[in-house]
From Swiss-Prot:
<feature type="domain" description="RdRp catalytic">
    <location>
        <begin position="397"/>
        <end position="597"/>
    </location>
</feature>
<dbReference type="GO" id="GO:0019079">
    <property type="term" value="P:viral genome replication"/>
</dbReference>
<keyword id="KW-0693">Viral RNA replication</keyword>
<comment type="function">
    <text>RNA-dependent RNA polymerase which is found both free and covalently attached to the genomic RNA. May also contain guanylyl and methyl transferase activities.</text>
</comment>
<dbReference type="Pfam" id="PF04197">
    <property type="entry name" value="Birna_RdRp_palm"/>
</dbReference>
<keyword id="KW-0696">RNA-directed RNA polymerase</keyword>
<dbReference type="GO" id="GO:0044423">
    <property type="term" value="C:virion component"/>
</dbReference>
<comment type="subunit">
    <text>Interacts with VP3 in the cytoplasm.</text>
</comment>
<dbReference type="GO" id="GO:0003968">
    <property type="term" value="F:RNA-directed RNA polymerase activity"/>
</dbReference>
<feature type="binding site">
    <location>
        <begin position="258"/>
        <end position="265"/>
    </location>
    <ligand>
        <name>GTP</name>
    </ligand>
</feature>
<keyword id="KW-0191">Covalent protein-RNA linkage</keyword>
<dbReference type="InterPro" id="IPR046750">
    <property type="entry name" value="Birnavirus_RdRp_C"/>
</dbReference>
<dbReference type="InterPro" id="IPR007100">
    <property type="entry name" value="Birnavirus_RdRp_palm"/>
</dbReference>
<dbReference type="Pfam" id="PF20489">
    <property type="entry name" value="Birna_RdRp_C"/>
</dbReference>
<dbReference type="InterPro" id="IPR046812">
    <property type="entry name" value="Birnavirus_RdRp_palm_sf"/>
</dbReference>
<dbReference type="Pfam" id="PF20488">
    <property type="entry name" value="Birna_VP1_thumb"/>
</dbReference>
<keyword id="KW-0342">GTP-binding</keyword>
Length: 878
């Protein structure tokens, strides 16, 4: 290949393709492949400079708060429910757990978090297909314009982009932009102040996100009434035959554990994660039984407990590794708010069992606009194109913070602007209300207890919305919800649902109109039109006669790409297959060629250390690129095919078992979820592509109650006029009767709900709800309870967020070493820690919060040092 680059003939042909005149002594490789790019120096790569930037932009920096120091405890004493696990050979539950029930100290914070800041992949020759593409381009005597476009697009991506984790400057800029969305031109608004109630929002979500009962793969779930350790159920004898029923959500064990275990993974602290969650829920339960939330000492004990657990609301702010533009490398970096693992676990226990068991969307439910669990393959995209081509309009689809509208034969792709920043705690309260009343409900009876209802409605929203985060050693405010928390999807989907509800009430104006844009101000939800395609039906129909010979049109390798319509439908475009007679998906061209230029690496990080995994990853990467659309582009297809074959030969020559590597091939690819249930040897052929795109009947829906086939428009109008009826309202009343912290007549409200429950007639098919309550009465009760729940949420949030004033807090931070050059990147804020007692101290009279019956361990050297320092400072003030 080096001979090709150094030949004069090659220079002439390549230069002609790009309109570049030959230059004496200049190598073609220098023209097409840029030199190694060195990212610019990050101007905010120290805590003091970062703090100054945030202060200058009015961003709230919080007073540093202390963490309890971790101490070692016997696992069998902390988690007696899981004592059996320690007897199983191969089980990894540690004999001791490092728990935070010792004296309190300020945490030491890792300045650098993986992936490393400032590092970027620049022309990754081990994976990049550029040279192979250029080589293949040289073999074409008369290059067509489409082939030239392929080379141009790929080389432009290599020149203009880089894969990496951006900069602290980019992270800080993103934080300020999130604050502007939340508090700027259209500040966030609580839905209850706009006339919504939790029940009316739930009735909208019944249409846009119908859910079923909790479960996994047809396995029924246990009620939400237990602590996490009791969600692992042993059946049988550990010394003989046994099984373990696992009712905990799936988690990524390689991801960050978060506070209070900075620098460790969830897999390394899984025992601690369960232990902290257990203790939190048990303390909450004990206080609720004592009437916590009412005025008096019990209320103070609850707030004291929440203050002890403040770190559950403080995420670690990581940069998201992406393919960023080099021109905006300093200012554009996406953030990931990594929740503390106990917070992630407890919220996931509410959302994951329901959402993972709800494959309900536009493909299998009439009138449902949801794209949740939508797969563009197996005829999925063709169904959407048929929906677009149908003459009825306006109409809409929705997925998280993405809205798609067909209006006046124009396709609109609309995104919520900085989607997570638009979310308020009340929005998440409404989302939790929906999951509990529609998912965790058995024929109207709740499958949850008071503790879980109180946590979901009154505590969880304050843990992840408008909470706080750590970046470097700064504790700062988070505006909106933390990106990547266990409720991110449903919160964003709820926001988009409210936008569509207002659009329906306005009689569905054109998205280009000022009337449509006025929804932003009314709801306090910002959005923008990302893409619009006029004459969408005409453009889609033109794909049929223009389809070129290829894998799915004649069964041959393509010599010219077929045209596409870039719908931006969750990143997918449409093209046409003559063989199948349907529209099939290809990844949007820009995204496809950017992915070809810069790989993300092995998706499952636990496989990274496996010998031979790099070559196996190459096989998967190149074949996956072909599957998601590379098959339609001749040069990219050939380059990926040749590179995958070379990687296969390398594995075979080294004696690595190829089949073993590729058995779980979807875990190696960033596109893995797309191919769920598709089993091939990972060699792209005409037959495999046809099988992947062959239409199959959609999965049957799994819902707890029938979905209104009249669609969202009918429900929006019925709610406005008060004509809507919903038999699921009973579980909502039970929830609102139990999940409150301050309602003085809670007993009376609960009795009312039980009275309604007993009024249900014997006939299971009878419309008992119609007979017992009118909509107006229900909404009136829900409105009262919603306001009470909101009041409780404010107090909960105040306990979790230790900000002493409403003004921007501007403490002086000591200058520390630059994290790019520091030999020891671990630093702490050397300030005296403030000691805080927990609920058990209030109950027992002494000591910090630790498991009941456990003796206080001996203080560590660090704790002794901090205590002596505090004593000296106290004496000096006297």
């Amino acid at each position: 290949m080096s001979d090709v680059f150094n030949s004069p003939q090659a220079r002439t042909k390549i230069s002609a393709a790009f309109g570049i005149k030959p230059t004496a002594g200049q190598d073609v490789e220098e023209l097409l492949i840029p030199k190694v790019w060195v990212p610019p120096e990050d101007p905010l790569a120290s805590p003091s400079r970062l703090a100054k930037f945030l202060r200058e932009n009015g961003y709230k920096i919080l007073q540093p708060r202390s963490l309890p120091e971790n101490e070692e405890y016997e696992t069998d004493q902390i988690l007696p429910d899981l004592a059996w696990m320690r007897q199983i050979e191969g089980a990894v539950l540690k004999p001791t757990l490092s728990l935070h029930w010792g004296p309190r100290v300020l945490p030491k914070v890792l300045l650098n978090s993986p992936p490393e800041q400032g590092k970027a992949q620049c022309v990754p020759t081990r994976h990049c297909t550029t040279q192979a593409d250029i080589y293949l381009f040289l073999q074409v005597p008369e290059a067509t314009e489409s082939l030239k476009d392929e080379v141009t697009l790929l080389t432009q991506n290599i020149r203009d982009k880089a894969y990496g984790s951006g900069t602290y400057m980019g992270q800080a800029t993103r934080l300020v932009a999130m604050k502007e969305v939340a508090t700027g031109r259209n500040p966030n608004k609580d839905p209850l102040k706009l006339g919504y109630t939790f029940e009316s929002i739930a009735q909208l979500l019944d249409i846009t996100l119908p859910v079923g009962p909790p479960g996994e793969d047809d396995k029924p779930w246990v009620p939400l009434t237990r602590v996490p350790s009791r969600m692992l159920v042993l059946t049988g004898d550990v010394d003989g035959d046994f099984e373990v029923e696992d009712y905990l959500p799936k988690i990524n064990l390689k991801s960050s554990s978060g506070l209070p275990y900075v620098g460790r993974t969830k897999g390394e602290t899984i025992g601690e994660m369960i232990a902290i969650s257990n203790q939190f829920l048990r303390e909450l339960s004990a206080l609720l039984k004592q009437g916590a939330g009412t005025k008096g000492s019990n209320k103070k004990k609850l707030l004291s407990m929440l203050s002890d657990y403040w770190y559950l609301s403080c995420g670690l702010l990581f940069p998201k590794a992406e393919r960023y533009d080099k021109s905006t490398w300093l200012t554009k970096t996406r953030n990931i708010w990594s929740a503390p693992s106990p917070t992630h676990l407890m919220i996931s226990m509410i959302t994951w069992p329901v959402m993972s068991n709800s494959p309900n969307n536009v493909l299998n439910i009439e009138g449902c606009p949801s794209l949740y669990k939508f797969n563009p393959f197996r005829g999925g995209l063709n169904r959407i194109v048929e929906w677009i081509l149908a003459p009825e309009e306006p109409k809409a689809l929705v997925y998280a913070d993405n809205i798609y509208i067909v209006h006046s034969n124009t396709w609109y792709s609309i995104d919520l602007e900085k989607g997570e920043a638009n979310c308020t705690r009340q929005h998440m309260q409404a989302a939790m209300y929906y999951i509990l009343t529609r998912g965790w409900s058995d024929n109207g009876d709740p499958m949850f207890n008071q503790t879980w209802a109180s946590f979901a409605m009154n505590i969880a929203p304050a843990l992840v919305v408008d909470s706080s985060c750590l970046i470097m050693n700064l504790q700062i405010k988070s505006y909106g919800q933390g990106s990547g928390n266990a409720a991110t999807f449903i919160n964003n989907h709820l926001l988009s649902t409210l936008v569509l509800d207002q659009w329906n009430l306005m009689k569905q104006p054109n998205p280009d109109s000022e009337e449509f844009k006025s929804i932003e101000d009314k709801l306090g939800i910002n959005f923008k039109i990302e893409r619009s395609i006029d004459d969408i039906r005409g453009k889609l129909r033109q794909l049929v006669p223009l389809a070129q010979p290829g894998y799915l049109s004649g069964g041959v390798e393509p010599e010219q790409s077929s045209p596409t319509v870039e719908l931006d439908l969750l990143g997918w475009s449409a093209t046409y297959s003559k063989d199948l007679g349907i529209y099939v998906p290809v990844l949007d061209k820009e995204r496809l060629f950017c992915s070809a230029a810069y790989p993300k690496g092995v998706e499952n990080k636990s496989l990274k250390s496996k010998v031979g995994i790099e070559q196996a990853y190459k096989v998967v990467r190149y074949e996956a690129l072909r599957l998601v659309g590379g098959w339609n582009y001749p040069l990219l297809n050939k380059a990926c095919k040749n590179n995958a074959s070379a990687a296969r030969r390398h594995l075979e020559a080294k004696g690595f078992p190829l089949d073993e590597f590729l058995a779980e091939w979807s875990e190696l690819s960033e596109f893995g979820e797309t191919f769920e249930g598709f089993n091939i040897k990972l060699t792209v052929t005409r037959e495999n592509l046809a099988e992947l795109n062959k239409p199959v009947p959609p999965k049957p829906p799994n819902v707890n109650r029938p979905v209104n086939t009249g669609g969202l428009k009918a429900v929006s109008n019925a709610l406005k006029t008060g004509r809507y009826r919903n038999e699921a309202g009973l579980s909502g009343l039970v929830l609102l009767a139990t999940a409150r912290s301050r309602l003085q007549d809670a007993v009376k409200a609960k009795a009312e709900a039980e009275k309604l429950h007993k009024s249900k007639p014997d006939d299971p098919d009878a419309d008992w709800f119609e007979r017992s309550e009118t909509l107006s009465d229900l909404l009136e009760k829900a409105d009262v309870a919603s306001k009470v729940a909101h009041s409780a949420l404010v107090e909960t949030s105040d306990a979790l967020e230790a900000v002493q004033s409403s003004s921007v807090y501007t403490p002086k931070y000591p200058e520390v070493k630059n994290p790019q050059t520091a030999s020891n990147p671990v630093v702490g804020l050397h300030l005296p820690a403030k000691r805080a007692t927990g609920v058990q101290a209030a109950l027992l009279g002494a000591g910090t919060s630790r498991p009941m019956g456990m003796e206080a361990p001996t203080r560590s050297k660090n704790a002794v040092k901090m205590a002596k320092r505090a004593q000296r400072q106290k004496e000096s003030r006297q």
